[in-house]
Each structure stands twice: as structure tokens, then as C-alpha cells.
Amino acid sequence: MQKRVVILLLDSFGIGASEDAKDFGDLGANTLGNIAKACFNNLADSNDRKGALKLPYLESLGLGLSALKATNELPLGFESKPNLIGAYAYAKELSSAKDTISGHWEMMGAPVLFEWGYFKDKNNSFPKEILDEIMRKTKIKGYLGNCHASGTEIIKDLGEKHLETLYPIFYTSADSVFQIAVHEEKFGLDNLYALCEEAFQILEPLKIARVIARPFIGANREDFKRTANRKDYAIKPHKKLLFETFIEEKQGEVISIGKIADIYAHVGITQKFKAGSLMELCDVTLEQIKNAKNNSLIFTNFVHFDSDYGHRRDISGYANALEYFDARLKEILDNLKENDLLILCADHGCDPSFKGTDHTREYIPVLFYHKDLQPAFLGKSESFADIGQSIAYFLGLSPLDYGKNLLNFKGQP
């Protein structure tokens, strides 16, 4: 029997502080719960949306019930007895970090049980010898930033000076990351990508998970904005991924939409499609669901929940984007084929109501839909790897080293 898997990952969509949140300074974080609370109390009203958070299709897959199991609290405005069509669980992260790469790798069978390298100093964040080597190897004459920063704020603060000098802007965050912002037209995309490649080679021995190209456009601080030509340079996964097993054992197609290919350093990816906005990500995902052949795994990362709303602590924007996604989810459900397995999940939290601008250590929702799957609670997962192990079971692949299968199909041999 030919099968397909569709994974929709809502980047940063946590459902409540996990039991180890205190170790990360994240007690009280709850991305979904705090957005729902703000909406219910009319604190997230805008020209685009008003009132309680309305996510009927996500609720039908078990989102609210998953959050209830994780936190003992139903998100405000959610149904206690929705018309349930999906099977649901919630998962804690086994990996040592709360970043994008750790979450994604873990769910495909490669939890990060080592410590990434970090730049912990808020100012003068990068070692001088590293900066000197980057300058020597790339021939840049100087740099700006060298600090922890919000990506949107630092281009406002330093973008005009960058245009005067063409010095790239270097910055980091609480994640294992080295980010480089330049003007896409004045500095040039090819020059930015070449700079990032050199920086990645220099930083890889320090276990810095990613170097990220962050191009922007505009003439002054009032109109600087980032473009869709972001590119991530990631360390290769340290363990074999589910993707590779699928290709080896079933000659499967692994279709990346959005930044998935970059996150996995292009390991085990057979096709990739870029998209610049939440609408485009939904459009391309729907197109692939309609057209991808059997024996395919379609994997989309919906990055804007994290980059545009979580990190920017924009509760109303996050809520509006969720409601837009939920409306598009109806289209996705309507276009699934007979034997498709749909999975909705996240990679970490990024509570827009929480202090700071960083990710938050939270449980994630794990929601499944398949015509032969009984709507039910599937339990608490001790690792995101249960997602990959469940996919391996569904596709008839060799088991992963981590995780347990959550699925039990009606009439499956």
C-alpha cells in the first residue's frame, strides 16, 4: 500500500512550560495558553482580528485537549468537547537546548544530547580571534554589532551605518547561532552567502549550530525590512535521520518546504521548495499535497510564527497568523489523499507574552490525522523522537534509535 506523510510544523508553537523549564528560566511560559488568554480578554484585538482565539480545525485535531493534558488548563475560549477527528499527544524535549535545530533533529531521530557552543556575552559577544579570522579570510574591512540583539531592531539601529560603511552586522542570541545582516542590494546576496559560508567553516569546530544570512532592504531606519532570502548554514546531523532510512528502504521522496532543508543541512532531502510568506508556505504545501506522488514525505516549517511574532513578542500578530493558518488547514484536510498521515507539531516555544525575545522551553502539541486512526489521547511523549518513530511505523521502516511509536490503526496488520 502506497502511503504519504505530511508534517506541518508551526515554528515556536509551544503549549506550556515543560517540567525542566526552570532550568532555562522559562517558568510560566505558555505560547498557546497566553495568546488564548490575551485574546479572550480582548487584549489582542487589532484591525485584523478581535475577540477569543478561533482555531476550529486545530481544535478538531486535538490542540486544546493536548494543551489541557500538558498543563491541566484548557486554553481560554477553547471547547472542552470539540468535534474530535484527530489523535493527539504532547511531547517534552529530550535535547539539551530549546533551539530550532535541536527540536527538528530530535523529531527525526537525532536528539542533541551534547552541548552546543554559545556566545553568552551580551556585548562584545564574539572572540576577537574569530572575528579576526573572518576578516582575514573574507577581506571585509570591518563589522558592526558584535552583540546579542533582535534581528529587526539591530537593522534599525545599525542599518544606516551599514549603508555608509558596507560593514556587515554580526549578532547572536541565546541560541547557538551567528547571524549576519547586510543590505541585499548594496552588499549583494552572493557576497553575503559567501561570507556566511566562510564564517560557518570557521565556527563549526566551536559547535555553533547555525550561521544565518539575514538580508534586508530599505533606505533608512524607518523602512528597513528583512527579505525572504534568508539562508541557514547548519551543522550536519550527528545521527542517521528518518529521511535517509526512508530513501534507502523505500526509495521515498522527502520534500522540504520553507527552511526544512537548511535545518537538516540538506541531508536526506530530495526536493526543496522555498516560500517567502505564511500565505506562500500554505500555498506551496497545498500544491505539494495535491501533486506529490505516493511514497512521499512532505515537511513544511511555518517559520513566521517564530520570526515575525514570537521573537517580536507580538501577541495579536501571532493570534492573527494562527487564525489564518487554521482557515488554510481546512483546505489541507480537504485535499488529503486516501492514505495520507497528517502530523501537526512544533519545535519549541516562543511565548510572545514572555520576558525577553528568546525561545521558551515548552511542551509541544503532537496532532495526528488519518482516516483509520481512532480519535483519542495518545499520552505524553518523553521525546520529540516519538514523532519520527511513529512515521517509521506507519511507513514500514526500520525503527529509529530513539522514540516510541504512538499510532495504532484500525485494521492494521
From Swiss-Prot:
Catalysed transformations (reactions): 2-deoxy-alpha-D-ribose 1-phosphate = 2-deoxy-D-ribose 5-phosphate; alpha-D-ribose 1-phosphate = D-ribose 5-phosphate
Cofactor binding: number and manner: Binds 2 manganese ions.
Amino-acid positions noted as binding Mn(2+) 2 in the UniProt annotation, renumbered to this chain: D306, H311, H359
SUPFAM superfamilies recorded: Alkaline phosphatase-like, DeoB insert domain-like
MF terms in GO: magnesium ion binding; manganese ion binding; phosphopentomutase activity
Annotated GO CC locations: cytosol
GO process terms (BP): 2-deoxyribose 1-phosphate catabolic process; 5-phosphoribose 1-diphosphate biosynthetic process; metabolic compound salvage; nucleotide metabolic process
Pfam families, A to Z: Metalloenzyme
Cofactor dependency: Mn(2+)
Locations listed in the record: Cytoplasm
Keywords, ordered alphabetically: Cytoplasm, Isomerase, Manganese, Metal-binding
Pathway membership: Carbohydrate degradation; 2-deoxy-D-ribose 1-phosphate degradation; D-glyceraldehyde 3-phosphate and acetaldehyde from 2-deoxy-alpha-D-ribose 1-phosphate: step 1/2
Enzyme Commission number, as recorded: 5.4.2.7
Binding site for Mn(2+) 1: D11, D347, H348
Family: Belongs to the phosphopentomutase family.
Function summary: Isomerase that catalyzes the conversion of deoxy-ribose 1-phosphate (dRib-1-P) and ribose 1-phosphate (Rib-1-P) to deoxy-ribose 5-phosphate (dRib-5-P) and ribose 5-phosphate (Rib-5-P), respectively.
Entry protein name: Phosphopentomutase
Organism: Helicobacter pylori (strain HPAG1)
